[in-house]
Amino acid sequence: TNVTPEMSYRFAKGETISNGVRDMTLAEPLDFYAVTDHAILLGMANLWADPTSDVGRHPKAKPYHNLNRPENLSSESAFNRFLLFNDIRGDSGGFPRERGSILDIIRAFFAQNFIFASAAYDHEEHLSAWKKIMEAAEEHNDPGKFTTFNAYEWTVRNQEPESASYHRNVIFKSSKAPKRPFSSFDSNNPEELWNWMDGLRSDGLDSLAIPHNPNGSNGQVFKKYKFDAVSYTHLRAH
């Protein structure tokens, strides 16, 4: 959580940065790059780490407190940070899935945005984090030398027995981008992600969803059925 989009681009162009455990430098600078941070609860970890923030004062935010302090950015604390990361991207349990107040739930209903119902969520911080990703891409884009993209990762993990992690890196074609990214809080159905992308395309904003880490998909890359369990063979026959 301590590496910013700005730092990521400097790393891609050959600078040395720290990942909290050791220094890292690429063998060769890259020609193009995109920051594909996880859209689900984007920007929230820094608030959870701050015990003075509104969401950081929640009792279940305590494991995240002071997450980015220097003494917590060591090899000894790496495993604990990994567990907290899994808590963020998981589809059940933990602070990220803690239900908010009845007012939060009502707001989520009328906004048709269920992330508002989470006690762990701050909408303005979420939009701010997304804006910083876009600003960093714009700042570091150098046509003909180093190409950047507005992008993010749609992150979803299935429940048991599959326990599959099968994500998509969503890359936007132009310097424009939607107000906020579509995350698994909106839907864990990839077909609805594609429908959202089609809607953006109709408005002139093209994008591409690239399957990410299919090795952890437990066979979901080559499913014979749609998300609603209708077989592709049946669809082709009708």
Language-model segment annotations:
Residues 1-236:
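Extended, charged catalytic domains and RNA/DNA-binding interfaces, predominantly
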